[in-house]
Amino acid sequence: MTIKPSLTIDDIARELGVSKTTVSRAISGKGRISAATRERVQAYIEEHNYKPNASAKSLAESKTYNLAIVLPRDFIKLDIPFVRTAMSSIVDEAHTLGYNVMLCLDDDTDSTPLMRTLDYRKVDGVILTRTVEDDHMVEMLTKRGIPFATLGSLPLKYAGAAVVEADHDHIGGCCAFAKAVLTGSDAPIALLGNDLNYIVNQNRLSGFRKACQELVIPLNRTPIRMGINDLEGCREAVEELLAQGVRRFLCMDEDVCVRTMTVLRDNGLSIPGDAQVASFADTDQIRNAQPPVSALSFDSAELARAACREFIHALNDDSYDPKPLLGYKVRLRQSMI
C-alpha cells in the first residue's frame, strides 16, 4: 500500500483508534504506554514508511508527561480538606491519562522549587490550587509562557491567561442557598467570611448579594463581616452581632462556621434553639457537627479531575473545555429552623 507523503500523527491515531498522545509516546519512546500498543504503532509506522517531520519529532521528544501541582505553603499548615481531596484526585486523573505529578510548595516570597522545576523543563504544565486577586504565580507563568490550569476562576485582569479555569458555580449556588435560608425567617442573618483576596470568597459574596437583591431584602437585615481569620476575630464579630440582636449566621467556609458555633456556645446559646448557623461549604466537619449544619455542597474531587483532564487534553492538542463549570447541591439540615 502506498502511503501519502502527508501522513501525520493525527492520521495514524485515527487509523489505529488511539490518541495523538499515544502515537507521540510510541515515536519518542517516552511516557507511560503498554508494550502491545507501542508495538502496534511502530508496526503501522514501518508498514506505511512513516517518517516524522522535524516538528512532529521535536514535539514528541520534548514532552515530559509530568505536571506540577503548586500548593501554597500555608495550606499544608492549615490541613484544608479541599487540598487533600484535590491533590489525590489530580494524581489519580493524571495517572489514568498517562501523566505523573510533582508537588511544588509556594509562598509569596519563595517560588524556588517551581522555578527550578521550570528551569530544568521537568514538566509540561502547571496546575494552581487557588486563585487570588494579586497572584505572583500567574504573572510569573504568563511571563514565561508556561501553560497552566487553575482550580477556581481567575480575576478579570488575568482573563485568558490560563489554558483551563475549572470552577464551581459559586455565584449561582450561593444565591440559591442564601435564598433558601433567607426565606425561612424574617429575622436578620449575618454573613461571616474570610479574606476577600481569594476569588472564591468574592464569588460567594456576589452570590449572597444577588440573593438579597432578588428577594428585595434591606441591608439592615443582612449585616456582612469579612476578614475573619481566627477564633478571636470571629468572637469579636459574632459577639458584636449578638449585641445587635442577630441570631442567625451564614458562614462562607467551614473554618468560619466551626468558630462561629464555638463562640455561640461559649455565650450560652444552643443551636438551633437559640441561634442558627449555615455554611457555604460542606465538609465532613460540617456534616458531622452537632447538630449537622445546613450547607452548600460542591464536589471538590470532580473539580480537580475536570481541571486535570481538560488541561491534559489541551496539552495534547485534543478538544477540551477551557472553562468547566460544575454544579452544586443545597443541603438543609438541623442547624437551621
Name these PLM-found stretches.
Residues 164-191, 209-210, 230-241, 257, ...:
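Hydrophobic alpha-helical segments within soluble ligand-binding/sensing domains
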Residues 129-175, 255, 281-293:
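Flexible loop/hinge segments that line or gate small-molecule binding clefts
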Residues 94-105, 209-233:
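Short beta-strand elements in bilobed, periplasmic/extracellular small-molecule ligand-binding domains
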Residues 235-337:
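Flexible loop/turn connectors
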Residues 175-215, 320-337:
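An alpha-beta-alpha
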Residues 123-129, 188-193, 224, 244-255, ...:
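Periplasmic-binding protein-like
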Residues 1-65:
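N-terminal helix-turn-helix DNA-binding module of bacterial transcription factors
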Residues 48-114:
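Amphipathic helical "hinge" segments at domain boundaries
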